Amino acid sequence: MRYHNITKDDMLNGDGLRVVLWVAGCEHCCKGCQNPMTWDQNGGLLFDESAKQEIFEQLDQPYINGITFSGGDPLHCANRDGVKQLMREIKEKYPDKTIWLYTGDSWENIKNYSMMKYIDVLVDGEFKLALRDVTLLWKGSSNQRVINVQATLSQEDTTVPVLYCGDHDDIPMGRETSHAPKLTDENIIQFNGGMDITCCGCQA
């Protein structure tokens, strides 16, 4: 598995304050994605022990709510094994931290993946430029869904996802300031080199 960046103290890619791992490799190549440098599975850096420890150091902090896997696509064939192994270690070491994952795949196609048992919230679906809406919470286009994975898996019919939250009016008052702010523009990835790059909802 390779990655492009580890973002710390992130408030845009999931509930609460989070650490975000941006992996390399994506086959969706969504039109309008402003993060195409993550599409190449051979790009970025090798995810090694030092990178893992960097994440663990963040998760050690009591104010960090959890980790978000984004990219790129964490479910790209080059990433699945590495992501699953890291998720397993995180759940064992930090059982109270939440795991979010962004993917361009649809829930219906991935719901039986064994790694789903480790994921708390999944944002699914390709970014659709025609459906782009910067007022949406935690996603870039209206076709995408923010899914409560464990609640969905506990149902008899797992093909109907339980949504983690609504998009606009049904978001509880105060949520924007107490947890994660509602998006007013594309998410920002701050690479170690100091260059800011906007990331649309593709972020799978």
How does the language model describe each region?
Residues M1-W22, N35-Q41, D167-D170, T177-G194:
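N-terminal [4Fe-4S]-dependent radical SAM core
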Residues Q53-F56, D60, K111-L131:
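Structural recognition of alpha->loop->beta junctions
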Residues D96, Y118-I119, N143:
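A generic structural signal for alpha->beta connector loops
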Residues M1-H4, M11, L17-R18, G32-W100, ...:
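Conserved Radical SAM active-site core
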Residues C77-V83, M87-K91, R132-G193:
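P-loop/Walker A phosphate-binding loop and immediately adjacent motor/lid segment at beta-alpha junctions
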Residues W22-M37, T198-A204:
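Local cysteine-cluster metal-coordination motifs and their immediate loop/turn environment
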Residues L12, E108, L131, Q155:
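Flexible, glycine-rich phosphate/dinucleotide-binding loops
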